[in-house]
């Protein structure tokens, strides 16, 4: 049975009588004082056993507690300001259903605010709601609005019960509370706590709304329902739960200091996230970081934390091995102790006389070194040494002593000692700086002098762990352990708080793996090289150990010479033997080295591109010699003597070598005839294959390659090799590949990967056509795995998107489809106009890019290729990788939103946009069914542009098939089954795999081919909706196109045969264009080098598709660049050099590769900006050219626009503009207006429609005609507008004044003239040939001539193209002269004479006919003649047509 003790402190009254309530009760809670105790017990329940800690936070206090009683109006509220936290309670005394009232608590902030709304449903599981959202929250609410609709982008939207366990009996036993900080919000609700991390600004203003007192009285007073406890300052409570008893008490002495320095170790040895890290420093052996974030290995995993209130004046000993953890605060670990940290809590006052007199370090071998500091620079036995803790009153000079002799001067003690950390490897840190290094240390002891000080320490036995450390002013302020999947992402992104989004998963470190070696089988001979180093040690005049330069190096004898030794075998192994002799004051070294004179010989890298201790690690050479003389040497090793206090270089060992594969260093003798290859298949292995090193998975393939031993990618990575013994080809793939993790609210909810195996702790999975997706969402077995996910499978709203991929909060994966609309039925054209005399109908092609293929780059994978040491170096570049990855991600998200808003599909239009619907008249209105052969006989060529419904390629046209099937990509990693095939490893990886292995992941485009075809098909179908003024039903496509032809080119009395002439020309042009597409693409496919000289539209398509692949290929090739390092392979560098030297070389690779990545990102962002402008142009073309008819000449093709159709193309759309190109012109003299005079009055008349031109014909009469085509007619008064006078006023200005009048004025002629003048010396008139001209589509003849030499096949294709182009050009349409000009001409005399003769001749003939046939016959003849003369020809009426622009 736990015993509970509570000591509560009385807080001062905050508001007093000025508290803004109608009725105020300020009192201690009384018999409900246990609320605070219960709250603290719940709060501290996360503490491990044996914890004794002071909790400091904005906790609830005993006083003040207020009860606000309002009137019955629910639109009133109370406002409190400058709060840090708020707690409230529901009073249960004498409360019935009639007394229950709701409550709305609002905490205002920017951009996020908080609301907690409580209803009267106290027994409901969802009686209240908390919202943390962006927006302005209401101060009052209603029970029916228990939602978070007032805000957006909610961080928390959660309903909860008012009473724990949904029972009214449990009400009143729990406090509700809110705490808000700049980077976190903590909510305490129904016994549970919620911590939400995000950045926000809080005003400290809190409002209470909807609270009111009931009108019922209990014992003559109004009932107190809601009680509030505003908190303005930090409160401290001490919690001790040792020996199974939990005690909560008030902290009264040094509470703030205790909270700042003492914590309870969490299970696993972790330091609590809310610990302040007061006086904890970043340990470093080099420069000290002032401020910033970095991922590093630091001793931050606590095995035991010992809070020490004070020390006695006695010696204390602390050992790394066998330390007793009896006084630990919190969890205890049994890990190996790496560093013991002494954290000192002192005030700013001088603390002389309080500290340690000396630190004794018991090093390996039994030698004890002492560290102490003195107020004078010269130490002696008579001076007093100490290491004062806290602030010192003057400089202190520190030394290392052995047996009272100062061996080494360390430097000046910092003016304030806050932390001392000592590692078992012999490093002594003060305030994080490496003050001294020696041999490994077993134990530490020191004498303490604390006097009457009331200070306390903490002693932390720690181990090294990887963590993201935030440093401010050289001190640690926050630590995030890289101990979980989501924390690993935080570490890779160098941020403690992850925003919602996709993040590349950093490669996991490869631990101890088997070693695979592949060598050529041969007869091997082996040589053992034993090098003996004899060190000579003696003491200086002050007693310090000195290594003599007379130390000698002995090489094996070869050819009676011991100065040079060359390897003459196939293999060798090098071993070093070290001896140590000492002397007194002379140079006769006979004594054994003991105590501080004990030294060992080490061979350092020196100037060689490989380390001495890596020679036996399968390094290969053509020649290798060791020499004691520098003559002819390529490099040298430094031979040093390592003592307990320092290292001293005594000699040099020179190396003569040549790179190659004839000689190999091995760890042991393997002489004889055999294949020394050792392979570990189908598992992660550390390999050395024909001298190329790395880490990967080796798999056997079925591939057969006749030549080569090993095969590499453009980046230089090993992709496969051949075993020459049996000819088997093996593939080499990475142990792990990059993946994209979906993070929502700080939790990994899913991951995109090509590996079909569990990762990131995610067990549920599904597959897509492009990759595998693992998630927390439980995909049931009812789903047929291996089929593509459809967005309808999971009904949820995606929280994060990347390209066309979306992930919901529950981890479900959805594809983001285009927006669907109903498609309004609106007319698209109006009126009928006449046509020119002669013209050609032309179909012109234009390609516009709409979107790009998004690329995700795992920066650490690209730069380091999974090497753990390189990853540590990469963290020194702080946010370089984060900036690169976020730039690509944000660009992709921006494009996703823009393209998604652009593409929408009308289902009704989609059904009509097909060849089947085009050739059908079943849906025609009866008025149109009378027309014969309404379908393909008129515009049969449309079948190549309109989509065809089929099961495999729905909504794709014939031209789209050609474009998507025959456009050649250049090195672009496509998102298809290749990604899954890469990780199979049963074939040699291609470029796609090489990019994927190096962290380059090409994701599906925002709008893939199917979406684009649906969108363009919907555009085509939309033309058929109500094309002729809104009929009862939709009409086929052909009729809609006819309406547009009529609008531009036909009169109301045009003959049906002229429509057929137009349709025939169109059909011929489209048919030949379709064939040209196929032939041109065949030519491109045969030789992609000819892209620049083939048709313009196709060349642009080809360029758009290939440009990103070329950029990715170039980025991959950069991995082969060594950037002045000794190798482009990081594994090879670490295999050759010691860690310190290899770090310097790898740093060059990191800098170079980051530069390459930055260049790629800059190129990508620039390209996205260009595509953004291109996408806007495409939208304008769709609205003006496809959905309507353009009045702009040249915008929708070069001519008078008739109609346009759009087809999907790779990464964009291809437009087919049908235009009229005039071939004959009528020259007229235009008049701007008419000036008329009437006596003294003069006035002017100008044409009202600016599209009309007034001109005088040859008959001296005036006519009006449209400017776009010659259509003369007699003017009417409605065509003119009268103006007051005929005078024209001009503003006199100079050329220099024009910019002030017309800001965008540019004198084009003068500008061109200036350019020509500048380049006149080198400028000649170009020779332009006009013999080849194509007025209809494309001119490919001249370009094809440039391609003839490339291949005979391409030449044959050009012959066919020439024929097709001739057919295209033969689309000249000569229509009847339909323009009518009504004139009155006076006939000459000979015309009248001829008429008279005809009459005289015809009258006898007519009389003869009448007499011959009888009276009735004569009358009938006359009647028939009269009827024929008087009647007029009847033409079929056309309905009036209206024209609108559909936006």
Swiss-Prot record:
Keyword Metal-binding applies: no
Region (Interaction with host ANPEP): 655-799
CDD domains: TGEV-like_Spike_SD1-2_S1-S2_S2 (cd22377)
Region (Heptad repeat 2 (HR2)): 1303-1400
Top-rank lineage group of the source organism: Viruses
Membrane spanning stretches: 1389-1408
Motif (KxHxx): 1443-1447
Region annotation Fusion peptide: where it falls in the sequence: 1020-1041
Function summary: S1 region attaches the virion to the cell membrane by interacting with host ANPEP/aminopeptidase N, initiating the infection. Binding to the receptor probably induces conformational changes in the S glycoprotein unmasking the fusion peptide of S2 region and activating membranes fusion. S2 region belongs to the class I viral fusion protein. Under the current model, the protein has at least 3 conformational states: pre-fusion native state, pre-hairpin intermediate state, and post-fusion hairpin state.
Protein name: Spike glycoprotein
């Amino acid at each position: 049975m736990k015993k509970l003790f509570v000591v509560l402190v009385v807080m001062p009254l905050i508001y007093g009588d000025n508290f803004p309530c109608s009725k105020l009760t300020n009192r201690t809670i009384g018999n409900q004082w246990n609320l605070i105790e219960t709250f603290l017990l719940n709060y501290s329940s996360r503490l491990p056993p044996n914890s004794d800690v002071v909790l400091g936070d904005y906790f609830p206090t005993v006083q003040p507690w207020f009860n606000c009683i309002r009137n019955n109006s629910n639109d009133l509220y109370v406002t409190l300001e400058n709060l840090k936290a708020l707690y409230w309670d529901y009073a249960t005394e004498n409360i019935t259903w009639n007394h229950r009232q709701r409550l709305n608590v609002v905490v205002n902030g920017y951009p996020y605010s908080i609301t907690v709304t409580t209803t009267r449903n106290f027994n409901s599981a969802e009686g209240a709601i908390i919202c943390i959202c962006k927006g302005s929250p209401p101060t009052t609410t209603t029970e029916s609005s228990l939602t978070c609709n007032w805000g957006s982008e909610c961080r928390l939207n959660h309903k909860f019960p008012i009473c724990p366990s949904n029972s009214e009996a449990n009400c009143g036993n729990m406090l509700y509370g809110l705490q808000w900080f700049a980077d976190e919000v903590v909510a305490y609700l129904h016994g549970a706590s919620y911590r939400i991390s995000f950045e926000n600004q809080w005003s400290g203003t809190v409002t209470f709304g909807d609270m009111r007192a009931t009108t019922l009285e209990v014992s003559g007073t109004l009932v107190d329902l809601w009680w509030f406890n505003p908190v303005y300052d930090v409160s401290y409570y001490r919690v001790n739960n040792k020996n199974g008893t939990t005690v909560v008490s008030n902290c009264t002495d040094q509470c703030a200091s205790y909270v700042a320095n003492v914590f309870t170790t969490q299970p696993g040895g972790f330091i609590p996230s809310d610990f302040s890290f007061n006086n904890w420093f970043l340990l470093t052996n080099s420069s000290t970081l002032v401020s910033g974030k970095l991922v590093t290995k630091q001793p931050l995993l606590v095995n035991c934390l010992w809070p020490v209130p004070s020390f006695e004046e006695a010696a204390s000993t602390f050992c790394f091995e066998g330390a007793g953890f009896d006084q630990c605060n919190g969890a205890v670990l049994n890990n190996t102790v790496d560093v013991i940290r002494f954290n000192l809590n002192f005030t700013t006052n001088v603390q002389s006389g309080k500290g340690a007199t000396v630190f004794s370090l018991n090093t390996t071998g039994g030698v004890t070194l002492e560290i102490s500091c003195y107020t004078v620079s010269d130490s002696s036995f008579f001076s007093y040494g100490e290491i004062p803790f806290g602030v010192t009153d003057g400089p202190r000079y520190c030394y290392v002593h052995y047996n009272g002799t100062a061996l080494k001067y360390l430097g000046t003690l910092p003016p304030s000692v806050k932390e001392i950390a000592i590692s078992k490897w012999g490093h002594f840190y003060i305030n994080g700086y490496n003050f001294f290094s020696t041999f490994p240390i077993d134990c530490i002891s020191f004498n303490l002098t604390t006097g009457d000080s009331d200070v306390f320490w903490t002693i932390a036995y720690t181990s090294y762990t990887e963590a993201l450390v935030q440093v401010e002013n050289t001190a640690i302020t926050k630590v995030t352990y890289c101990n979980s999947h989501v924390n690993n992402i935080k570490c890779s992104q160098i941020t403690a708080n992850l925003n919602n989004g996709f993040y590349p998963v950093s490669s996991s470190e490869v631990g101890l793996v088997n070693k695979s070696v592949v060598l050529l089988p041969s007869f091997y001979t082996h040589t053992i090289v034993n090098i003996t180093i004899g060190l000579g040690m003696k003491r200086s005049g002050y007693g310090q150990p000195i290594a003599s330069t007379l130390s000698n190096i002995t090489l094996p004898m070869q050819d009676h010479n011991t100065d040079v030794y060359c390897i003459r075998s196939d293999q060798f192994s090098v071993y070093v033997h070290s001896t140590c002799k000492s002397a007194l004051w002379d140079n006769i070294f006979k004594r054994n080295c003991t105590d501080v004179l004990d030294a060992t010989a080490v061979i350092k890298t020196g100037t060689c591109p490989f380390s001495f201790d890596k020679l036996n690690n399968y390094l290969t050479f053509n020649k290798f010699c060791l020499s004691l003389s520098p003559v002819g040497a390529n490099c040298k090793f430094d031979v040093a003597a390592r003592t307990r206090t320092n290292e001293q270089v005594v000699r040099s060992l020179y190396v003569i070598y040549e790179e190659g594969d004839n000689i190999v260093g091995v760890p042991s003798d393997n002489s004889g005839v055999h294949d020394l290859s050792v392979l570990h298949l189908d598992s992660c292995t550390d390999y050395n294959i024909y001298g190329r090193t790395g880490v990967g998975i080796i798999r056997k393939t079925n591939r057969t390659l006749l030549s080569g031993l090993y095969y590499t990618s453009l980046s230089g990575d090993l992709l496969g090799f051949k075993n020459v013994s049996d000819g088997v080809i093996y593939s080499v793939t990475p142990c792990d590949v990059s993946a994209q993790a979906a993070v929502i609210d700080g939790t990994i909810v899913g991951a995109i990967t090509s590996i079909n195996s569990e990762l990131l702790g995610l067990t549920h999975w599904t597959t897509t056509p492009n990759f595998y997706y693992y998630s927390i969402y439980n995909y049931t077995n009812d789903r047929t795995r291996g089929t593509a996910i459809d967005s309808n499978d999971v009904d949820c709203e995606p929280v994060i998107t990347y390209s066309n991929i979306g992930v919901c909060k529950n981890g479900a994966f959805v594809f983001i489809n285009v927006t669907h609309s109903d498609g309004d039925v609106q007319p698209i054209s109006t009126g009928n106009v006449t046509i020119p005399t002669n013209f050609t109908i032309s179909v012109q092609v234009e390609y516009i890019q709409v979107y790009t293929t998004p690329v995700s780059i795992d920066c650490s994978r690209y730069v380091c290729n999974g090497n753990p040491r390189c990853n540590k170096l990469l963290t020194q570049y702080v946010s370089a990788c984060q900036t690169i990855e976020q730039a690509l991600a944000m660009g992709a998200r921006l494009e996703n939103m823009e393209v998604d808003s652009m593409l929408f599909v009308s289902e009704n239009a989609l059904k009509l946009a097909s060849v089947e619907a085009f050739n059908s008249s079943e849906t025609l209105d009866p008025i149109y069914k009378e027309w014969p052969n309404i379908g393909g006989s008129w515009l049969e060529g449309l079948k190549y542009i309109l989509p065809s419904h089929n099961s495999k390629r729905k909504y794709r046209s014939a031209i789209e098939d050609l474009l998507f099937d025959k456009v050649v990509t250049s090195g672009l990693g496509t998102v298809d089954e290749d990604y899954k095939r890469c990780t199979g490893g049963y074939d040699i990886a291609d470029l796609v795999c090489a990019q994927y292995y190096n962290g380059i992941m090409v994701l599906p485009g925002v709008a893939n081919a199917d979406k684009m075809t649906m969108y363009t098909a919907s555009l085509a179908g939309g033309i058929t909706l109500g094309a002729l003024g809104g009929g009862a039903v939709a009409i086929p496509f052909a009729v809609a196109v006819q309406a547009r032809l009529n609008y531009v080119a036909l009169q109301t009395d045009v003959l049906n045969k002229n429509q057929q002439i137009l349709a025939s020309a169109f059909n011929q042009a489209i048919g030949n264009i379709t064939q040209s597409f196929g032939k041109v693409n065949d030519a491109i496919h045969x030789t992609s080098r000819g892209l620049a000289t083939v048709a313009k539209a196709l060349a642009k398509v080809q360029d758009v598709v290939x440009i990103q692949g070329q950029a990715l290929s170039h980025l991959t090739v950069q991995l082969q660049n060594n950037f002045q390092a000794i190798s482009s392979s990081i594994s090879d560098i670490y295999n050759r050099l010691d860690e310190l030297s290899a770090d310097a070389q790898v740093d060059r690779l990191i800098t170079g590769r980051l530069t390459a990545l930055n260049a790629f990102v800059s190129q990508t962002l620039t390209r996205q900006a260009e595509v953004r402008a291109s996408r806007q142009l495409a939208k304008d073309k769709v609205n003006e050219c496809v959905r309507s008819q353009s009045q702009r000449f040249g915008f929708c093709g070069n001519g008078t626009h008739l109609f346009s159709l759009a087809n999907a193309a790779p990464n964009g759309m291809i437009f087919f503009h049908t235009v009229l190109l005039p071939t004959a012109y009528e020259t007229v003299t235009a008049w701007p207006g008419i000036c008329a005079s009437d006596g003294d009055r003069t006035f002017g008349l100008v044409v009202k429609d600016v599209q009309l031109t007034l001109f005088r014909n040859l008959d001296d009469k005036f006519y009006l005609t449209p400017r776009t085509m010659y259509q003369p007619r007699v003017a009417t008064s409605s065509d003119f507008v009268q103006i007051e006078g005929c005078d024209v006023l001009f503003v006199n200005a100079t050329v220099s004044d024009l910019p002030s009048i017309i800001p965008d004025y540019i004198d084009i002629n003068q500008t061109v003239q200036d350019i020509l003048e500048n380049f006149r010396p080198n400028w000649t008139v170009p020779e332009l040939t006009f013999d080849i001209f194509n007025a209809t589509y494309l001119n490919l003849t001249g370009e094809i001539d440039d391609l003839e030499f490339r291949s005979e096949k391409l030449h044959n294709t050009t012959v066919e193209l020439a024929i097709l182009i001739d057919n295209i050009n033969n689309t000249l349409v000569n229509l009847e002269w339909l323009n009518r000009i009504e004139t009155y001409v006076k006939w000459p005399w000979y015309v009248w004479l001829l008429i008279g003769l005809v009459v005289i001749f015809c009258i006898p003939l007519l009389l003869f006919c009448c007499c011959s046939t009888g009276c009735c016959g004569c009358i009938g003849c006359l009647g028939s003649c009269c009827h024929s003369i008087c009647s007029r020809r009847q033409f079929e009426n056309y309905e009036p047509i209206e024209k609108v622009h559909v936006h």
